[in-house]
UniProtKB/Swiss-Prot annotation:
Entry protein name: Large ribosomal subunit protein bL21
Keyword Ribosomal protein among record annotations: yes
GO cellular component: cytoplasm; ribonucleoprotein complex; ribosome
Gene assigned in the entry: rplU
GO terms of molecular function: rRNA binding; structural constituent of ribosome
NCBIfam families: L21 (TIGR00061)
Length: 103
């Protein structure tokens, strides 16, 4: 059984027990998170697709850790002027384990 959920502006295919990294969600380690935006569920050959979401379907996950993504460097430069600026960014992410998929 697997489901497709929408979180953080992205779609993720998940199954029970999967470890998933998503955009930062509020909460701390051990907290439970419920996803109500379930776009599709497949169970034993039967596929149910929502328009746009499935009513009554939910996916429950548990937060494993709050982490940061890889460092991204941004470099700005003006030609012939000697101006340049280098900045960095690390995206806040949440790592979670999927506990339950229900229809």
């Amino acid at each position: 059984m697997y489901a497709v959920i929408k979180t953080g502006g992205k779609q993720h295919r998940v199954s029970e027990g999967d470890l998933l990294t998503v955009e930062k969600l509020a909460g701390s380690k051990g907290d439970s998170v419920v996803f109500d935006d379930v776009l599709m569920v497949a169970k034993e050959g039967e596929i149910r697709v929502g328009k746009p979401v499935l009513e009554g379907a939910k996916v429950v996950g548990e937060i494993v850790a709050q982490v940061k993504g890889p460092k991204i460097y941004v470099f700005h430069m003006k030609k012939r002027k000697g101006f340049h600026k280098k900045t960095g960014h690390r995206q806040q992410l949440t790592r979670m384990r999927i506990k339950e998929i229900s229809i």
